[in-house]
C-alpha cells in the first residue's frame, strides 16, 4: 500500500477510520452516530469529536428523539474536533480529518477549510443510504468548497 500526499499509508488511513468509528459510538444520538478524529503530520492524534449537544446542554431522550429539537442543538463531529482542539490550544493546520458516519456537510467544510485541515477521509458507504441521501446536496457543496480551497478528500 502506497502513501498519499499527506504521507499517511492506506493501512493507517483504515486504522484511523476505525478509530473514528469507535468514537462515533460515544454519541447519544439514537439515529445517527458520527465520529471524527484529526491526525497530525507525524501520525499523532490531535483531537476527536462526535455528534452531540454542547457541553452543559441537557441531552434528554425527548430532545434526542425529536428531530427538530435535536438539529437545533447538535454539534457535528467535525466541528467538535475543531472546538476541542481550540479549547486545548492545538492547531489543526495541515492535518488529516477522518470522519465515520456521513460525508462532511457544507457547514462543517467551512470550519475544516478555515482551520487549515488539508485532507478529509471518509469510508465508502452505500449510495442509497437514506441518511446519506438527505445530506447529499450539502456534501456536493462541501466538495465544491474543498476543490476551490485545495482541501483533498477521498472515500476509502
Task: Locate predicted features.
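Zinc-dependent deaminase catalytic domain
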Residues: 1-156
Amino acid at each position: 500500500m502506497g502513501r498519499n500526499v499527506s504521507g499517511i499509508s492506506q493501512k493507517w488511513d483504515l486504522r484511523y477510520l476505525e478509530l473514528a468509528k469507535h468514537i462515533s459510538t460515544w454519541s447519544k444520538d439514537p439515529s445517527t452516530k458520527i465520529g471524527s478524529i484529526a491526525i497530525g503530520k507525524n501520525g499523532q492524534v490531535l483531537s476527536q469529536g462526535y455528534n452531540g449537544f454542547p457541553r452543559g446542554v441537557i441531552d434528554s431522550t425527548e430532545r434526542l428523539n425529536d428531530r427538530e429539537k435535536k438539529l437545533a442543538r447538535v454539534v457535528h463531529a467535525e466541528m467538535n474536533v475543531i472546538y476541542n482542539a481550540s479549547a486545548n490550544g492545538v492547531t489543526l493546520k495541515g492535518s488529516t480529518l477522518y470522519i465515520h458516519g456521513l460525508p462532511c456537510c457544507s457547514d462543517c467544510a467551512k470550519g475544516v477549510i478555515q482551520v487549515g485541515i488539508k485532507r478529509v477521509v471518509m469510508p465508502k458507504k452505500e449510495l442509497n443510504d437514506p441518511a446519506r441521501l438527505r445530506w447529499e446536496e450539502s456534501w456536493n457543496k462541501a466538495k465544491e468548497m474543498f476543490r476551490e480551497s485545495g482541501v483533498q478528500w477521498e472515500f476509502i
